[in-house]
Amino acid sequence: MSVEKTNQSWGGRFSEPVDAFVARFTASVDFDKRLYRHDIMGSIAHATMLAKVGVLSDAERDAIIDGLQQIQAEIEAGSFDWRVDLEDVHMNIEARLTDRIGVTGKKLHTGRSRNDQVATDIRLWLRDEIDTILAEITRLQEGLLGLAEAEADTIMPGFTHLQTAQPVTFGHHLLAWFEMLGRDYERLVDCRKRVNRMPLGSAALAGTTYPIQREITCQLLGFDAVGGNSLDGVSDRDFAIEFCAAASLAMMHLSRFSEELVLWTSAQFQFIDLPDRFCTGSSIMPQKKNPDVPELVRGKSGRVFGALTGLLTLMKGQPLAYNKDNQEDKEPLFDTADTLHDSLRAFADMVPAIRPRREIMREAARRGFSTATDLADYLVRKGLPFRDCHEIVGHAVKYGVDSGKDLAEMSLDELRRFSEQIDADVFDVLTLEGSVNARDHIGGTAPNQVRAAVARGRKLLAQR
């Protein structure tokens, strides 16, 4: 053990000061100081409530609030001296408050524990983060709607198993991402409801003997409700886990989107081009233009998934109530919020700037017998059972593979080898336009349905 010693603010019960290494090892101020604004907000509300119930005088309340506001100004000016020996954001601020206003500063913590204090701080912080993230989701969705509307008639191949399946419009494809992000938005809105419950007043674990009125601090801090059990109030980290789960789903969606953008920008696809400002080059290969933004977002999804797993593992073995283990909740939570926010911001900036290569997309849609299902549906309308039609078209596709011809490139006589039900009108359904226009229903790829979906999407966003 190291011989350097340091004193803590709770040292009254101890016969020797804590070891200096242990002090550094157990301190959290290096990362939890980002909670300072919310810590001060909670303390101001707590002091206001204590004055209302007569625990503090009005003069003491005013001195505390003024001191806290001055401390916030110091922190934001970069002149605050963060001390590791004071462990965390809470004790750093309280110690500085006492330096500023004297013994009155020591009264702030009356009826409160760091256990309910930190739980309150995290909820206040996460509530703000969710609001910021929701705004970025909306901004990305707006970009998708604009691009989808512009590309409502642009035809590209749709894929299953990464093999050409059926023609779709680029606008329709983009709207799939709009839908996924909409679910992400809803999950985070729902998560926010459970974040916005106030633990302050739970004290260490059993509540407090002081005549506090939790409804006052609840209203001052903008919480929806007061937590109903003090043990749960200081122990609960469900809200953080739930946020990381919702964030993981959102990052999974962005990762899938990223994978498509990486594929589409490759020389093998060439479906889209990204502006140079969203790409980087190679230190050795002069020709390279690398889609680093989507690649990095794809990679960053893993750290968010890891944070979720880490928080679940952190909580699974803890008895009630608070344990020091919970200090480990903040870094994965902070990192998850930062990563999701930055990834959404990058995509919200980048997506409206995507430049589709329409002719290349269209040519790709012509290949791979993408209208085979349309031919089968055509034969169904002629009165044949679908399974028979499926087999007939399968034979036609095999012939096309052997002869190097797409279905639309075959002559009527060639097509009639497989079914005498085929007439000259078949070529209307074998065109790319005929294929996408035929899927004219809600959720379909027809251009007019894409435009209708864009209109519905804009109405949805306007109601947020």
Swiss-Prot record:
One of its GO terms (biological process) is arginine biosynthetic process via ornithine. The keyword ATP-binding does not apply. It is found in: Cytoplasm. InterPro entries: Arg_succ_lyase_C, Argininosuccinate_lyase, Fumarase/histidase_N, Fumarate_lyase_CS, Fumarate_lyase_fam, Fumarate_lyase_N, L-Aspartase-like. Pathway: Amino-acid biosynthesis; L-arginine biosynthesis; L-arginine from L-ornithine and carbamoyl phosphate: step 3/3. Keywords: Amino-acid biosynthesis, Arginine biosynthesis, Cytoplasm, Lyase. GO terms for molecular function: argininosuccinate lyase activity. It catalyses: 2-(N(omega)-L-arginino)succinate = fumarate + L-arginine. Signal peptide: none annotated. Its EC number is 4.3.2.1. One of its GO terms (cellular component) is cytosol. It is an enzyme of class 4 (lyase). HAMAP family: Arg_succ_lyase. Belongs to the lyase 1 family. Argininosuccinate lyase subfamily. This is Argininosuccinate lyase. It comes from Pseudomonas aeruginosa (strain LESB58). The lineage of its organism: Bacteria, Pseudomonadati, Pseudomonadota, Gammaproteobacteria, Pseudomonadales.
